[in-house]
């Protein structure tokens, strides 16, 4: 019996130690991470402005996340003792910060023996970026829906104004339209539930196609109308999102794959496309 209790308490001590650290250290094993903050150009600091939705991707590490509304983010690194995740190979890794209508920002971090290599300029030993990541805007987009609030008995068209601001002298985009001798007829709207990515209605014209168009500085206004009665939208709050993809050659193929295949399609996959936009509220009472 004495030997039994000796073995039992020996096992208990070993089990507790393993829960703390496999090498009987003082610190508990926890998920390692890289943290930081992002500030968007032409957006006020939080809480006056929102910096959420920035796509953060660590190239070569296979991890990604998005920023919270205050611009903060956390990339969870694989645990050092988790063989299923694979070891982090020694070397430098690039963290990409992406929005479709902002310039890509990058931070390079280094790993050695599976650990973050800290330095005085980039990252702390705890994995916190020492500087705020700033992202410069390529173009802005604000959507105005008229009327914004639909009451009982309304049976007219809903008008959507899309104001595009081009920060460089020229930006090329892809959008849905019909080209005629008299000009262009624009279409291509997603109407989704405001509190989810559930698609409620698509505004489209059968003969419209996705076409490339240049947006000269200072910008352009697009007008799109659709028949409210045919939408059959139920009571609720919605967000109206114009289909628009910024034409750019600086996006790595791996970054596109990390976002999700088909993000540039005119369907619900478009909701995967990280893009900073404002407005678009539609309330049906």
Features from the language model and the residues they span:
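A short, solvent-exposed loop/turn motif at the edges and junctions
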Residues: 86-118, 124, 128-130
């Amino acid at each position: 019996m004495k030997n039994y209790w000796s073995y039992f308490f020996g096992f208990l001590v070993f089990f507790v130690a393993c829960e703390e650290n496999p090498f009987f250290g003082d610190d508990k094993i926890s998920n390692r991470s890289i943290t930081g903050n992002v500030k968007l150009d032409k957006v006020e600091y939080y809480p006056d402005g929102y910096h959420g939705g920035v796509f953060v991707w660590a190239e070569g590490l296979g991890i990604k996340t998005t920023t919270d509304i205050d611009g903060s983010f956390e990339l969870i690194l694989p645990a050092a003792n988790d063989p299923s995740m694979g070891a982090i190979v020694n070397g430098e890794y690039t963290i990409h910060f992406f929005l479709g209508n902002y310039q890509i920002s990058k931070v390079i971090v280094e790993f050695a023996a599976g650990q973050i290599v800290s330095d005085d300029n980039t990252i702390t030993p705890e994995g916190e970026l020492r500087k705020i990541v700033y992202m410069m805007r390529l173009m802005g987009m604000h959507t105005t829906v008229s009327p914004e609030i639909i009451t009982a008995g309304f049976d007219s068209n809903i008008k959507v104004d899309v104001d595009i601001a081009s920060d460089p002298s020229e930006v090329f985009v892809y959008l849905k339209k019909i080209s005629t001798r008299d000009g262009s007829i624009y279409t291509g709207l997603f109407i989704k539930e405001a509190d989810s990515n559930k698609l409620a209605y698509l505004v489209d014209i059968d003969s419209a196609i996705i076409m490339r168009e240049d947006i000269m500085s200072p910008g352009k206004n697009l007008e799109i109308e659709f028949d409210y009665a045919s939408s059959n939208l139920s009571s609720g709050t919605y967000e109206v999102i114009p289909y628009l993809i910024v034409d750019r050659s600086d996006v790595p193929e791996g970054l596109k794959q990390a976002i999700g295949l088909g993000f540039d399609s005119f369907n619900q996959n478009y909701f995967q496309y990280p893009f900073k936009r404002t407005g678009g509220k539609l309330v049906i009472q």
